[in-house]
Amino acid sequence: MSGTNQFVLVCDWLGRPTTANKAHNMHHHAVSHDRRQWREAGLQLALVNKVPAMAGASFDVQAIYRRGPMPDTDAVAPAFKGFLDGLVDAGVLPGDTGAFVRSVRYLAPRKLASDQEIAGVAALVVTITGETA
């Protein structure tokens, strides 16, 4: 029996999500290290939140900032790529190809509404809407 589930995962301990411009200007070893951190975050959040295995999923991705400049809407793609790899590692999806990732929608970044909203200086918020396997 399959159904639709939705999970909101908030990574607020790694600081500002890595942007495309930042990754472009980093040494390739630094990019690899950064992606591993986001990958581990996706893995841990999936396990802690008990996200089940899914046959496929759609993703809404949004960055939240306490202060500082607001990047382009899709600038956080490098952070999300690592995060998505972590979801695959956790067994949420069998892979990150188009066969399993139905869509990725980047929502405009926003400033914090209150100091209680997140623990860190910034957060990557990933909403997963998926069909359970």
Identify the residue ranges that each predicted region occupies.
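Catalytic phosphate/metal-binding cores of nucleic-acid and nucleotide-processing enzymes, i.e., regions
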Residues: 1-133
